[in-house]
């Protein structure tokens, strides 16, 4: 079960959250408002409080609002299709956004899940692989993207 918390204080885009369990430095969390989820990152921990930086406007937030921690750090998604995109610092696809400013709570996936890519295997059935081993490759235009065993891979 993920750690949860409630907003105890707000100073601009710094939000103080009283947490009910463990959180980590740089962990991602979401503030759940009535209509959107706002992404934030833990920048400091002190006692039962996590100090989080919200990546967009905190206007309208109130104390007592629920915050859910993901257990994950801020991560970049890598894979075929990424080189032809325009991203901001949180890997929002700016070409899919409408208008000059991002809508509050609006997020786009970094990669298109429904796009089909031709996979060329580099590993053979029965090969022993470890985290980081190349399994195959996928070409995006003329650039081959190596597909690797995930770094959190455990087991056979």
Question: Model-derived features: where do they sit?
Answer:
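Peripheral, non-AAA+ core regions of ATP-driven protein-machinery
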Residues: 1-156
């Amino acid at each position: 079960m993920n750690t949860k918390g409630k907003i105890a204080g707000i100073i601009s885009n710094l939000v103080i959250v009283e947490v009910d369990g463990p959180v980590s430095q740089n962990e991602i969390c979401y503030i759940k408002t009535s209509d959107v989820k706002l992404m934030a990152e833990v920048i400091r921990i002190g006692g039962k409080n996590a100090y989080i930086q919200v990546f967009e406007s905190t206007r309208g937030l109130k104390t007592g609002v629920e915050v859910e921690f993901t257990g994950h750090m801020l991560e970049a998604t890598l894979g075929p299709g990424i080189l032809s995109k325009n991203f901001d610092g949180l890997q929002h696809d700016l070409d899919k956004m409408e208008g000059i400013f991002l809508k509050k709570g609006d997020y786009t996936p970094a990669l298109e899940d429904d796009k089909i890519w031709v996979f060329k295997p580099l590993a053979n059935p029965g090969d022993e692989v470890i985290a980081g081993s190349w399994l195959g490759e996928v070409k995006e235009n003329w650039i081959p993207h190596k597909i690797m065993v995930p770094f959190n891979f455990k087991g056979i």
